């Protein structure tokens, strides 16, 4: 798996962000700084400080009807950080071999999703707001929107990585 060093001084999970992290883990919850104040609390997420990439795009989903799901795709190059800014929802991550579901319901926590990971968001509570910080601007060619195509893509990537390892 690809290893990466995330620059900065804060935390990814419970580890300092500058330590090596396995960028192919099936998601990682990152706890962001919380500033408690009687006038209202504040949480901040800075790219390359609190999350392991520079932020190129921000988008959010809201008013998701009951029973509907979002996502249903993977990215070839774009990393994402998903936050339940309000309410709650579930995110199921799938690398073609295993799946893991996270329930997001705290605005001071987010889910880091690396490249080549299929994601599906569902179980949205009423009034929920899903905030996503992305490492790349929107490019349709970065998306894999069909699951069968995704499985072929990750199988090909895994074969390429195995060949590189054997040739070293």
Q: Locations of the language-model features?
A:
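Short, Lys/Arg-enriched N-terminal segments with co-localized hydrophobic residues
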Residues: 1-22
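Non-catalytic, conserved peripheral segments adjacent to functional cores
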Residues: 20-109, 126-127, 132-133, 138-168
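Well-ordered alpha/beta subsegment
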Residues: 106-110, 116-118, 122
């Amino acid at each position: 798996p690809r290893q990466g060093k995330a620059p900065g001084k804060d935390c990814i999970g419970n580890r300092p962000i500058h330590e090596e992290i396995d960028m192919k883990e099936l998601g990682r919850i990152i706890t962001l700084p919380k500033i408690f104040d009687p006038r209202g609390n504040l949480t901040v997420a800075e790219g390359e400080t609190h999350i392991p990439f520079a932020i190129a795009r921000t988008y959010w989903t809201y008013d998701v009807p009951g029973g509907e799901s979002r996502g249903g795709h993977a990215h070839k190059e774009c990393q994402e950080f998903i936050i339940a800014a309000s309410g709650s929802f579930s995110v199921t991550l799938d690398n073609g071999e295993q799946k893991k579901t996270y329930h997001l319901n705290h605005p001071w926590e987010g889910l880091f999703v690396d490249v080549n990971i299929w994601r599906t968001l569902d179980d949205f509570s009423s009034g929920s707001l899903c905030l996503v910080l992305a490492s790349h601007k929107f490019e349709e060619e970065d998306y894999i929107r069909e699951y069968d195509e995704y499985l072929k893509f990750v199988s090909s990537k895994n074969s390429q990585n195995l060949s590189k390892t054997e040739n070293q």
